[in-house]
């Protein structure tokens, strides 16, 4: 059921200079928190797990010198709504998340835009580019191989390094209760295990991630995101197996991270997109936090 759309100004961002926080009531029924700043062509940047839109705090101000930069919190994450799920996990499918993003850009009167997604955000971006090829002009995916590919090639090393892919998909409330017992520990373990440049996540940023993560509704929503990835998202991908991303796709990944070590990243995406290029940066899973200068250099060169 569609809902009347609206925008509410929350005030200046505490984390990203010259950006404004806003809430958008989308036609999908979701109230989405996002930050916006800058002028120029539209550019959307979407976080992954276990983050929120503030993961872009080191790169967004410079991108905003050339673009109107939109930084949403995905449904289930941050200060965006966490809708009730269903047995098939459809509300947390990448298809539904992509609808939210298109609805937001429609509300902002930005029918076309470039897209940068990290982690789960890039998985939403994959679906976004397939379902709305007329809207996405260019795409950057950060530190992922395709979901179906990663599941199909699962081995001991991947299952050990990315254990949460298999932990979070267990039936509720098993993972929810275990994480909820000590979300601070779980979040520290997760982030510290993926970054390779220590100190890149300031205490203030970590505490903001934790503020959101310790909400039981967030924990459940995150589990549903992963449950969807292991079920209905794979069904959607299988149904669209003959479709490819039409816009130019650029890939960045951390040379010291799991994805870069286990996969031919560009090769995996050549099966999914028409035009693919990419390269590694000397970091772990989160280039935008670990090596923002290198990230900006590569992304701006591609977008320009």
State the predicted function of each range.
Residues 40, 48-51:
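Active-site glycine-rich loops that stabilize anionic/oxyanionic intermediates
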Residues 45-48, 71:
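Structural cue for short, hydrophobic secondary-structure segments
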Residues 58-67, 107:
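A short, Lys/Arg-enriched amphipathic alpha-helix followed by its capping loop at the start of a domain
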Residues 2-25, 32-35, 39-42, 70, ...:
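Flexible "cap/lid" subdomain of the alpha/beta-hydrolase fold that forms the substrate-access gate
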Residues 50-58, 69:
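Serine-hydrolase catalytic-loop signature spanning alpha/beta hydrolases and amidase-signature enzymes
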Residues 54-57, 220, 297:
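Alpha-helical elements of the RecA-like P-loop NTPase motor core of helicases
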Residues 283-296:
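Catalytic histidine-centered segment of alpha/beta-hydrolase-like enzymes
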């Amino acid at each position: 059921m569609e809902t009347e759309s609206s925008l509410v100004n929350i005030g200046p961002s505490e984390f990203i200079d010259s950006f404004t926080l806003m809430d958008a009531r989308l036609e999908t029924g979701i109230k989405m928190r996002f930050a916006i700043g800058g002028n120029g062509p539209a550019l959307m940047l979407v976080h992954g797990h276990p983050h929120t839109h503030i993961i872009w705090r080191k790169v967004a101000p410079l991108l905003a010198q050339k673009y109107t930069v939109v930084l949403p919190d995905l449904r289930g994450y941050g200060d965006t709504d966490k809708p009730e799920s269903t047995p098939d996990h459809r509300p947390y499918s990448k298809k539904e998340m992509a609808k939210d993003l298109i609805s937001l850009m429609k509300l902002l009167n930005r029918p076309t835009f470039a897209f940068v997604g990290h982690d789960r955000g890039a998985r939403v971006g994959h679906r976004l580019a397939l379902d709305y090829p007329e809207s996405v002009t260019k795409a950057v995916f950060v530190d992922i191989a395709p979901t179906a590919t990663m599941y199909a090639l699962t081995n001991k090393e991947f299952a050990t390094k990315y254990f949460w892919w298999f932990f979070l998909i267990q039936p509720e409330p098993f993972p929810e209760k275990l994480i909820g017992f000590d979300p601070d520990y779980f979040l520290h373990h997760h982030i510290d295990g993926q970054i390779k440049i220590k100190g890149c996540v300031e205490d203030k940023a970590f505490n903001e991630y934790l503020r959101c993560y310790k909400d039981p509704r967030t924990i459940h929503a995150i589990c549903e995101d992963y449950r969807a990835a292991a079920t209905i998202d794979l069904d959607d991908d299988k149904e669209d197996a003959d479709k490819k991303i039409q816009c130019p796709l650029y890939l960045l990944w951390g040379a010291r991270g799991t994805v870069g070590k286990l996969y031919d990243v560009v090769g995996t995406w050549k099966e999914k997109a028409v035009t693919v290029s990419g390269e590694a940066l000397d970091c772990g899973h989160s280039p935008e936090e670990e090596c923002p200068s290198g990230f900006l250099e590569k992304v701006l060169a591609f977008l320009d």
